[in-house]
């Protein structure tokens, strides 16, 4: 039976944080959100419930001169994710634009973990000095609990522009996409029997991915297995020039032998005899005696 979202306790009805002033910063700076009290969280934890954000409203009220320029970027991060993947939604709007930002969560979290959502802001391309108290932020948070998580229909973030000199063409907002999933087939000996039609069932030594055509394409799985079983099956598609291995080892060896200077045993003996004779003649000639005058 599907779990239904229960009516949250009164403590979970739009918990409001204080409307606080924040200093201008070019780096991500946290906006403090007020979450349910520890006692309320403990009550929900004892009932073995999980929790999600139904609705989050971030109110931005500027306090800068009318000739101030720049953009404010507000981001919601989920700290259960790695640092470079934690961003969930973001908004960009002019620094002089009073605006309400609306966010709807699409996931539950366990109360056994710290509350994962963090809210940050930063200002870019501005002519206002850093550390100036440029605006006030206020957060409103509505949460709900469930006995266990259920699929939540996606609701896109949105905005409500309060300054008349700005329109929807002056703001932007975005939300992350669903995580990508690629099924990885289990390696097994009988994966060569692929793509069978009819009712899908697995046999001993097989995997669901090897028998079905869901997820990874049949051709991909087939080619991966066939490449291992028959690595040379597609060589006939190549031209003869590519397949020609060149001269055989015996021909190459014979050609090398022919390229060397060769002589018979008799010729070698004659060469040695002549060389020795020349050496003797040149070293054994009697020296001419000098006459005494």
Swiss-Prot record:
Record note on modification: Phosphorylated.
Record-level GO BP terms: transport of virus in host, cell to cell
GO cellular component, one term: host cell plasma membrane
Keywords: DNA-binding, Host cell membrane, Host endoplasmic reticulum, Host membrane, Host microsome, Membrane, Phosphoprotein, Transport, Viral movement protein
Acetylation in keyword set: no
Coiled coil ranges: none
Classification via Pfam families: Gemini_BL1 (PF00845)
InterPro entries, sorted: Gemini_BL
Topology in membrane: Peripheral membrane protein
Single GO term (MF): DNA binding
Compartments reported by the entry: Host cell membrane; Host microsome membrane; Host endoplasmic reticulum membrane
UniProt record similarity statement: Belongs to the begomovirus movement protein BC1 family.
Biological function: Movement protein involved in the cell-to-cell and systemic transport of viral genomic DNA. Begomoviruses use 2 proteins to transport their DNA from cell to cell. The nuclear shuttle protein (NSP) shuttles it between nucleus and cytoplasm and the movement protein (MP) probably transports the DNA-NSP complex to the cell periphery and facilitates further movement across the cell wall.
Subunit organization: Binds to dimeric supercoiled plasmid DNA.
Protein name, entry field: Movement protein BC1
Natural source organism: Tomato mottle virus (isolate Florida)
């Amino acid at each position: 039976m599907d779990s239904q979202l229960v009516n949250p306790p009164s403590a979970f009805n739009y918990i409001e944080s204080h409307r606080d002033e924040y200093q201008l910063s070019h780096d991500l700076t946290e906006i403090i959100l007020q979450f349910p009290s520890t006692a309320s969280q403990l009550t929900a934890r004892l009932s073995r419930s999980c929790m999600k954000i139904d609705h989050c409203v971030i109110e931005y009220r500027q306090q800068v001169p009318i000739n101030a320029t720049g953009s404010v970027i507000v981001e919601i991060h989920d700290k259960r994710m790695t640092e470079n993947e934690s961003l969930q939604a973001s908004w960009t709007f002019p620094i002089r634009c009073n605006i309400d930002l609306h966010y709807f969560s699409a996931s539950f979290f366990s109360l056994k973990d710290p509350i994962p959502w963090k809210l940050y802001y930063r200002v870019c391309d501005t002519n206002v000095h850093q550390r100036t108290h440029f605006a006030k932020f206020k957060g409103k948070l509505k949460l709900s609990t469930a006995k266990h998580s259920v699929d939540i229909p996606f609701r896109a973030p949105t905005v409500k522009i309060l300054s008349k000199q700005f329109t929807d063409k002056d703001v932007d907002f975005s939300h992350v996409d669903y995580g990508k999933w690629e099924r990885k087939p289990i390696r097994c000996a009988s994966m060569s029997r692929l793509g069978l039609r009819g009712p899908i069932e697995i046999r001993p030594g097989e995997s669901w991915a090897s028998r079905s055509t869901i997820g990874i394409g049949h051709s991909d799985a087939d080619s991966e297995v066939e490449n291992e079983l028959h690595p040379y099956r597609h060589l006939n598609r190549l031209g003869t020039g590519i397949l020609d291995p060149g001269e055989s080892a015996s021909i190459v060896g014979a050609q090398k032998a022919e390229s060397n200077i060769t002589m018979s045993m008799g010729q070698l003996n004659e060469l040695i005899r002549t060389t020795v004779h020349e050496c003797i003649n040149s070293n054994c000639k009697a020296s001419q005696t000098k006459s005494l005058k």
